[in-house]
């Protein structure tokens, strides 16, 4: 299994990036927050998990070991695949996911596009005994932090990344653009992760 990649970022797309290692380019599917921190032409270290299906093999990338472990734990829930697991981590941090599950907070879990009441209840029931380590902050003990440059990116890049992420999560282009414009007008200092969460909260009426 490919557990990590260190190499040059040669392409950044809407939901994935290509990292070249020893002349081979690997496509890594990841969250908008991670994508926003990658810089084309510069080196990055990304922790990865490979998901093998009958029709495809995909690499998923993560900022730290905690995020990677949560991705795997989420997929133990019946009916929840890698796409929805990644959507969960695009909206909520591993700590927020674990707290919502521990506190039986279905409303917080339903902030994730694709997670309705039934799936939120299923997450709470099936994972309540599996997320205590995340809440305690011990899952990534010994884990390696991703090495990414330029975490603070320009506002226009935040707008583009967040709008594209929202469209990818199922919102219309107009809904996405309006929500991003609103939250950045209220707080121009927001980074991609913060803007995405604020926009999702607005779109869900929170």
Curated annotation (Swiss-Prot):
Disulfide bonds: none annotated. The RuvA-RuvB-RuvC complex processes Holliday junction (HJ) DNA during genetic recombination and DNA repair, while the RuvA-RuvB complex plays an important role in the rescue of blocked DNA replication forks via replication fork reversal (RFR). RuvA specifically binds to HJ cruciform DNA, conferring on it an open structure. The RuvB hexamer acts as an ATP-dependent pump, pulling dsDNA into and through the RuvAB complex. HJ branch migration allows RuvC to scan DNA until it finds its consensus sequence, where it cleaves and resolves the cruciform DNA. CDD domains: UBA_RuvA_C (cd14332). It is found in: Cytoplasm. GO terms for cellular component: cytoplasm; Holliday junction helicase complex; Holliday junction resolvase complex. Signal peptide: none annotated. One of its GO terms (molecular function) is four-way junction helicase activity. GO terms for biological process: DNA recombination; DNA repair; SOS response. Belongs to the RuvA family. Keywords: Cytoplasm, DNA damage, DNA recombination, DNA repair, DNA-binding. Homotetramer. Forms an RuvA(8)-RuvB(12)-Holliday junction (HJ) complex. HJ DNA is sandwiched between 2 RuvA tetramers; dsDNA enters through RuvA and exits via RuvB. An RuvB hexamer assembles on each DNA strand where it exits the tetramer. Each RuvB hexamer is contacted by two RuvA subunits (via domain III) on 2 adjacent RuvB subunits; this complex drives branch migration. In the full resolvosome a probable DNA-RuvA(4)-RuvB(12)-RuvC(2) complex forms which resolves the HJ. Residues 64-142 are annotated as: Domain II. Residues 1-63 are annotated as: Domain I. The keyword Transport does not apply. This is Holliday junction branch migration complex subunit RuvA. Gene3D superfamilies: 5' to 3' exonuclease, C-terminal subdomain, DNA helicase RuvA subunit, C-terminal domain, Nucleic acid-binding proteins. Residues 143-153 are annotated as: Flexible linker. Coiled coil: none annotated. Residues 154-206 are annotated as: Domain III. HAMAP family: DNA_HJ_migration_RuvA (MF_00031). The keyword Cell inner membrane does not apply. Has three domains with a flexible linker between the domains II and III and assumes an 'L' shape. Domain III is highly mobile and contacts RuvB.
């Amino acid at each position: 299994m490919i557990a990590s990649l260190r190499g040059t970022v040669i392409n950044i797309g809407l939901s994935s990036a290509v990292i070249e290692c020893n002349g081979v380019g690997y496509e890594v599917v990841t969250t908008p927050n991670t994508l926003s921190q990658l810089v084309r032409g510069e080196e990055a270290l990304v922790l990865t998990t490979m998901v093998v299906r009958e029709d495809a093999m995909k690499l998923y990338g993560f900022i730290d070991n905690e995020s990677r472990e949560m991705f795997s734990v989420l997929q133990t829930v019946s009916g929840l695949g890698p796409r929805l697991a990644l959507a969960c981590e695009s909206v909520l941090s591993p700590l927020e996911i674990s707290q919502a599950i521990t506190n039986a907070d279905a409303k917080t879990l339903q902030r994730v596009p694709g997670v309705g009441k039934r799936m939120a209840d299923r997450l709470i029931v099936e994972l309540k005994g599996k997320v205590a380590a995340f809440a305690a902050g011990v899952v990534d003990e010994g884990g390696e932090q991703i090495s990414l440059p330029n975490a603070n990116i320009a506002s226009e890049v935040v707008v583009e990344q967040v709008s594209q992420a929202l469209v990818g999560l199922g919102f219309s282009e107009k809904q996405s653009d309006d929500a991003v414009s609103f939250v950045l007008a209220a707080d121009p200092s927001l980074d991609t992760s913060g803007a995405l969460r604020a926009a999702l909260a607005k779109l869900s009426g929170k």
